[in-house]
Regions:
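ATP-binding/phosphotransfer module of carbohydrate and carboxylate kinases, centering on a glycine-rich
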Residues: 4-8, 65-263
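Short conserved micro-motifs at the rims of enzyme active sites and ligand-binding pockets
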Residues: 27, 60-61, 204-205
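Short glycine-aspartate micro-motif
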Residues: 12-16, 22, 35, 46-48, ...
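Conserved A3 ("GATE") glycine/threonine-rich loop of ANL adenylate-forming enzymes
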Residues: 1, 17-22, 42, 49-56, ...
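Conserved phosphate-binding catalytic cores of ATP/NTP-utilizing and phosphoryl-transfer enzymes
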Residues: 1-14, 24, 29-35
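Conserved beta-strand elements of beta-rich interaction domains across eukaryotes
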Residues: 20-22, 28-30, 54, 198-199
Length: 263
């Protein structure tokens, strides 16, 4: 967010849609009730949402049996619920869980030994991009090589549909986090600076993300352009840290030391 805002004043939110998912935005310190700094109420402060942990109590998000299995088999069961349903680290595994279920029910790869399919995290999210982006024989050949099975054309088309559904749900969930910030802050336009492999490399993520945002924020269907759009923020963490360091040094020179630990 800070890295992008340095060059783009229309930046309203910074987001990561990659191995994990998260977002940050600027809030007035007067709205942060537990904060006591002596700063003017309108002073802006960056808020790190950490919404990858949203609904760890499992009371809101409708989880499938595949989501539940991934959570229970993870190193930290019951944590990062939202992230496990939408982030790049898990989308490929959700796809694998679905296909493994189909195999166990005798729906795909009939009569074949599919031990590779049973390997956890054997399929990464990047392969879902391949399935969606390449409708031809090359993608099917790669699928066969990955799982060491023969894939019929019907099975290949099914796998493409599953990949599409998993990736679409992930993109729409990612939209929910950003749209919640927009609604809370009354944001009607601006740029969401996004970094991460899913945002930058999945061929259909941005389109699906934008469609969902329009639905949630009730944009008119006949709009000429989207009021809120994704912009690229590659290496935002590194550049942003440098910008924040420079800003902090300037604050110290100006005698503003709230929130700065004295050494």
């Amino acid at each position: 967010m800070i890295a992008s805002a340095y060059n783009d004043p229309d930046t309203i939110i910074g987001a990561i849609f990659g191995t994990g998912c998260n977002a940050a935005y600027m809030e007035n310190v007067g709205s942060i009730l537990k904060l006591s700094t002596g700063l003017a109420p309108e002073t802006p402060m960056a808020i790190n949402c950490e919404y990858g942990a949203f609904d760890n109590s499992h009371k809101v998000l409708p989880r499938t049996k595949y989501d539940i299995a991934i959570d229970e088999e993870s190193p930290r069961p019951g944590e990062q619920t939202f992230e496990k349903m939408s982030a790049g680290l898990y989308l490929g595994e959700i796809f694998r869980q679905v296909m493994c279920d189909f195999y166990d029910r005798g729906l795909v790869f009939k009569g074949q030994e599919a031990s590779q399919l049973r390997r956890s995290y054997r399929i990464d999210t990047g392969f879902l991009s391949v399935l969606e982006d390449d409708p031809g024989e090359e993608a099917r050949d790669r699928f066969e090589a990955l799982l060491n099975v023969k894939v019929t054309w019907e099975e290949f088309k099914l796998s493409q549909r599953v990949a599409e559904m998993v990736a679409t749900r992930g993109a729409r969930l990612c939209t929910c986090g950003v749209s919640a910030i927009c609604r809370m802050k009354g944001i009607n336009s601006g740029h969401v600076a996004a970094d991460g492999s899913v945002a930058n490399k999945h061929p259909k993520f941005k389109k699906r993300w934008a469609e969902a945002l329009g639905e949630i924020l009730d944009w008119p269907e006949d709009r000429k352009e989207d009021p809120v759009t994704i912009t690229s923020a590659e290496d935002g963490s590194g550049i942003g840290a440098a910008v924040i360091s420079a800003m902090t040094m300037q604050r110290i020179k100006n005698g503003i030391t709230a929130g700065i630990k004295q050494q």
